Amino acid sequence: MRPEESAREKIDELLSLAGWSVQDLERFNLKSSLGVAIREFPIESGYADYALFVDGKLVGLSEAKPEGMTLSGVAEQTERYSSSIPEKFHIKGENVRFLYESTGVETFFRDKKDPSPRSRRVFAFHRPETLKE
């Protein structure tokens, strides 16, 4: 198993523990749970590793990286991906608000509505009800 595949397995488990229903793009159901995490979600510039939907609305993205990778540099990639979300998924004319980078061992998070948004380490993914607007 490649290191990134191992990280994705751990991230799937972390998302599930936080109350997310982790689903594949080919057979997802946004109504199956308050929070749905879709793997390999298409965006204008490629694919986001995870798209996080709460109540059917796209609220966040998460990028998966192999264990041992420094996540601080990945924040720029996640930011770029958040800027290439198709407009039909924008909420109130705004782009995705919550961004994560994770190795499955270490997870960073930022809220783009913070006055000075910056990534910070968190111990777990937020629960869907916490991210509900």
Report the location of each language-model feature.
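Accessory nucleic-acid engagement/destabilization modules that flank
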Residues: 1-133
